């Protein structure tokens, strides 16, 4: 009887020891997952900001030309070469598209009023009213495929250069990118290769629902979560190592 009691105590001690080891291992894996999620969230922010720099370069040219870009198509061509995921670049004075590159496959966009389109107006209005670049999408393209866009509002003073004049809304610079191609430099596929399950989501601006943009094949269980702060939008990157 005494021997049985000793055996039970030893078994219980072994179980508690193993349980403790497993608990520590899970905590370590979770901490590692938190580091990985933070790293990739930062990468996504950087890659998106780098892609969106095209819009700011167009803005600089627009200001230099006091609201006009005489060589728009030449400059736009070079910007597309810099960011191969770019689908098109638009100039929209007062929200109405007047120039688009590449022209031939996007010429139907000429005359399109971004403020009048119920499916696209929300982000355009938010960009104008906030005075900040705003992400639209990702959304389905009419010609097929999936894309996201940046709407950059431009405000300018009087052409005479009166520094006391209040800047007025000129319009929007819109750059559209193929999605998820725009995120290729992030190398999300490395997460799968290194035994991580991940999911990238966004909050729908109208419904508040969480919409999954990209994910691993496996389902996440007790994931680590991190917001990805983007222009006038937040995405959510969540992930977890296999444990």
Give the positions of each predicted feature.
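Intrinsically disordered, low-complexity polar/acidic regions
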Residues: 30, 34, 38, 63-236
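Juxtamembrane extracytoplasmic/periplasmic/luminal helical "stalk" adjacent to the first N-terminal
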Residues: 6-67
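Conserved small/polar residues in nucleotide/adenosyl-binding loops
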Residues: 241-243
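Positive-inside N-terminal membrane-insertion signal
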Residues: 1-5
């Amino acid at each position: 009887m005494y021997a049985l009691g000793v055996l039970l105590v030893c078994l219980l001690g072994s179980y508690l020891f193993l349980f403790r080891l497993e608990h520590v291992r899970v905590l370590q894996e979770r901490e590692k997952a938190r580091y990985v999620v933070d790293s990739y969230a930062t990468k996504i922010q950087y890659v998106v900001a780098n892609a969106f720099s095209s819009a700011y370069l167009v803005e600089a040219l627009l200001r230099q030309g006091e609201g006009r870009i005489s060589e728009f198509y030449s400059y736009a061509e070079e910007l597309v070469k810099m960011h191969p995921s770019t689908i098109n670049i638009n100039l929209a004075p007062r929200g109405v598209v007047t120039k688009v590159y590449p022209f031939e496959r996007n010429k139907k966009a000429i005359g399109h009023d971004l403020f009048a389109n119920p499916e696209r107006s929300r982000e355009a209005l938010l960009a104008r009213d906030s005075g900040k670049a705003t992400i639209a999408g990702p959304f389905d393209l009419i010609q097929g495929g999936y894309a996201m866009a940046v709407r950059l509002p431009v405000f300018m003073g009087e052409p005479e250069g009166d520094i006391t004049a209040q800047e007025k809304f000129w319009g929007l610079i819109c750059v559209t990118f193929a999605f998820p191609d725009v995120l290729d430099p992030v190398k999300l596929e490395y997460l799968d290769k290194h035994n991580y399950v991940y999911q990238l989501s966004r909050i729908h601006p109208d419904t508040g629902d969480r919409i999954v943009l990209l994910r691993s094949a496996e389902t996440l269980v007790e994931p680590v979560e991190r917001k990805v702060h983007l222009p006038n939008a937040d995405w959510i990157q969540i992930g977890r190592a296999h444990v």
